[in-house]
Amino acid sequence: QAFDGVIISHWSDTLSYTSALVSFLFRHTPVPVMLTAADRPLADVKSNGLENFKAAVDFITNAGLKGVFVSYRDKQGKQAIYLASRLCQADAYLDVFTPFGGAPFGYMEHGAFIPNISPCNPKPEELRADQKPVFTQPPVFITPVLMVQPYPNMQYDLFPVQNTKVVLLYLYHSATACTQGEEATSVLPFIERCRRQKTAVYGASFKRRQASGLYATEHALLQAGVAPLFNISPEAAYTKLCIAYNQNETET
């Protein structure tokens, strides 16, 4: 191989979406792929862009791991390394990112990678295993995915589904949404409209797979035909559906 790693310098606003996409499509790369961004323009002396880029270089040089990662300073000022598939959108006030599950993969300290031991994280040696490419042909993205995030008094009848193939309901943290009350503000008539239009509906993020531990609202969603996605961020769920509903290639 002619290089030790790849660095993608990215606009911060959509970094979490691109990170998820690159993570799913390039899991097989034999060298680390690093994404990074800055909280301010690089000409601003307060920008963290240079530190984030340097940490990406140090990780490639010293960590001895392959996979897709994000280098970005956290709110404590530590140089965090995130699994790219778990990065969540930056806070609108502090401009800092957080990982789904709350645990960064590790930190860069004086040029060395320090793993963050957590039940949420894979062990570093797990990332050294070889992975098969997801696709042999370049992916295509033509069919859009409609992502709906419920909030109180949401008017579901405002969402047209006639030309929509797939909907992602990114639910409240308990995997719930309003299932009672007026037809316009209950998610169940919306799901029924999707069913009649042959529109697939996915819900995230579910925690429990055992029916005995579900809330009544979770039961109602599943009984209405929602396909559950478990323990997944909005960005990762959206990106996976974009990939799944746009490719013709299947694994052999």
For the regions a protein language model found, what residue spans apply to each?
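Active-site histidine-anchored catalytic micro-motif
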Residues: 1-252
